[in-house]
Swiss-Prot record:
Record's protein name: Phosphomethylpyrimidine synthase
Biased composition (Basic and acidic residues): 22-39
Cysteine disulfide links: none
Region of interest (Disordered), ranges: 1-59
UniProt organism field: Bacillus cereus (strain ATCC 10987 / NRS 248)
Gene3D superfamilies: 6.10.250.620, Radical SAM ThiC family, central domain
């Protein structure tokens, strides 16, 4: 008997503290765009308005929603897709045991119950990409939805997609996903990588990681599974994912040939693309820029080729002494992509894996080829983003952004960090967030998170949380630096709450309310401490913000200007400081 994955097997939580799920009505009937509304307490009887923030958590944080993983999420986009009249349902390819990396299907594998659904594809001669619609002046329902999430006009969304500066990854076979956009003129997005390996993790664990990542703010997830049950794991994830799902198809193709890179063929790879497109994968990382002539250049590197996909294709090219079949068949790949609206994430197979290799000839040679491939994809109206490094010291980061915008004609940049130093295993979420904040400021559209386990092991759900929060910090810092019109509102609200000692509001407005309250309560756990005008750092006598309040009160009571009050107030505080023994902490 086939097993299943149930909600009881994984940890699903309701809304974050002090928050509730709200929905904004869209322009068409039934369109409801989710937001997270953070409540605030009053200040001396004066109301502080609730703060609405972008929400990626899907229905899992809606108390009215009953989670049934075996049924998958509701599919609001399904009717939008059918209404356009350019798709057809068909039988699809037969799912085989080889798709899960086995010769005989295991009775213990929890197969998703709805495997008999028919996939959709474009009708003969049709193109169903969001870029195709945008270039023909059509504002789709997906674009209207995105406009509400981003706080912009639908026409602006359409134009950014039409001109290739943004992508809206939305496979017609993933109608469960809530539409989102990736582009430098929108909020900086964060991707979280999940997926099993040959030695670790189960299907239930990966579904849990997906719901966990989106709860903390992941805008997309990539399933990078390389072990058994790749197809089945992906089916469970996609059917329950409220965000776009990306993959690296070469990983599964390699499993189909028993892990022997030289046995890969275009036919096996093509079959894998169609398999994943029928399931609903929204974007593919394709390492079509790893050309035969670039491989020898990497020989003088400190760390060679560090991309898994890049190394697989390099091994194939060298064994056969032929050009990369992903490059030679690129037009055919475009034909597949536009039948399902799968977006390209053109892989950086030659990205630097160490500071010593940053911005070298191999890296930028591949980037030139990615620019060439971008033009070909756009000729087919297929959406494209470009993957970037990697390991890059701070002073070399800006050059990466400038070259990508120039060579790839403004296509969205999607970077892994970059890591700004190589000496901190166990802390690479920090070394990379430094680079991520910088390159996000310079124009990168989406940041691929790095967890504390980078270079060390497969991340668990706690590592996923740490990685997502770290990268939400980097993305938000980049939004602030770019002057995004609404980015500062949450900062301003939290700063006001901090100055007014509204501790619960401080916790609730933060990116990780649970962690903030946990740290506060380690030293001041009493409920009364949630209203105290100090914390354990400075104590009640030397809290700078309490002193500032005292100065303002002094000015008010003595009818003084603030500057004069500060001078007089500071003299009094100096006297008080001396009288208490000149000790800073008490």
């Amino acid at each position: 008997m086939k097993q299943s994955v149930s909600a009881e097997q994984i940890e699903l939580k309701s809304s974050l503290p002090g928050s509730k799920k709200v929905y904004v009505d869209g322009p068409r009937e039934g369109m409801k765009v989710p937001m997270r509304e953070i409540e605030q307490s009053d200040t001396n009887g004066v109301p502080n308005p609730p703060i609405r923030v972008y929400d990626t958590s899907g229905p899992y944080t809606d108390p009215e929603y009953k989670v049934e993983l075996e049924k998958g999420l509701q599919a609001p986009r399904h009717s939008w897709i059918l209404e356009r009249g350019d798709v057809e349902a068909y039988e699809g390819r037969e799912v085989k045991p080889e798709d899960d990396g086995v010769k005989v299907a295991s009775k213990h594998t929890p197969v998703f119950p709805q495997m008999d659904r028919k996939p959709l594809r474009a009708k003969q001669g049709a193109n169903v990409t969001q870029m195709h619609y945008a270039r023909n002046g059509i504002i789709t329902s997906e674009m209207e939805y995105v406009a509400i999430r981003e706080g912009v006009e639908p026409e602006f969304v359409r134009k950014e997609i039409a001109e290739g500066r943004a992508i809206l990854p939305a496979n017609i076979n993933h109608p469960e996903a809530e539409p989102m956009i990736i582009g430098r003129n929108f909020h900086v997005k964060v991707n979280a990588n999940i997926g099993n390996s040959a030695v670790s993790s189960s299907i239930a664990e990966e579904v849990e990681k997906m719901t966990w990542a989106t709860r903390w703010g992941a805008d997309t997830i990539m399933d990078l599974s390389t072990g058994k049950n790749i197809h089945t794991t992906r089916e469970w994830i996609i059917r329950n994912a409220p965000v776009p799902v990306g993959t690296v198809p070469i990983y599964q193709a390699l499993e189909k040939v028993n892990g022997i890179a030289e046995d890969l063929t275009w036919e096996v790879y093509r079959d894998t693309l169609i398999e994943q497109a029928e399931q609903g994968v929204d974007y593919f990382t394709i390492h079509a820029g790893v050309l035969l002539r670039y491989i020898p250049i990497t020989a003088k590197r400190t760390t060679g080729i560090v991309s898994r996909g890049g190394s697989i294709m390099a091994q194939w090219c060298l064994f056969h002494h032929k050009e990369n079949f992903l490059y030679t068949h690129f037009e055919e790949i475009c034909e597949i992509m536009k039948q399902y609206d799968v977006s390209f994430s053109l892989g950086d197979g030659l990205r630097p894996g160490s500071i010593a290799d940053a911005n070298d000839e191999a890296q930028f040679s591949e980037l030139e080829t990615l620019g060439e491939l971008t033009k070909i994809a756009w000729k087919h109206d297929v959406q494209v983003m470009i993957e970037g490094p990697g390991h890059v010291p701070m002073h070399l980061i800006k050059e990466n952004m400038e070259k990508e915008l120039d060579i790839c004609q403004g296509a969205p940049f999607y970077t892994l960090g970059p890591l700004t130093t190589d000496i901190a295993p166990g802390y690479d979420h920090i070394t990379s967030a430094i680079g991520a904040a910088m390159i996000g400021w310079f124009g990168t559209a989406m940041l691929c998170y790095v967890t504390p386990k980078e270079h060390l092991g497969l991340p668990n759900k706690d590592d996923v949380r740490e990685g997502v929060i770290t990268y939400k910090i980097a993305a938000h810092a980049a939004d602030l630096a770019k002057g995004h019109k609404t980015a500062h509102q949450r900062d301003d609200a939290l700063s006001k709450a901090r100055f007014e000692f509204r501790w619960r509001d401080q916790f609730n407005l933060s990116l990780d309310p649970e962690r903030a309250m946990e740290y506060h309560d380690e030293t001041l756990p009493a409920e009364g401490a949630k209203t105290a005008h100090f914390c354990s750092m400075c104590g009640p006598k030397f809290c700078s913000m309490r002193i500032s309040h005292d100065i303002r009160e002094y000015a008010k009571e003595n009818d003084l200007e603030t500057t004069e009050a500060i001078e007089k107030g500071m003299k009094e505080k100096a006297k008080e400081f001396k009288e208490t023994g000149s000790h800073l902490y008490q």
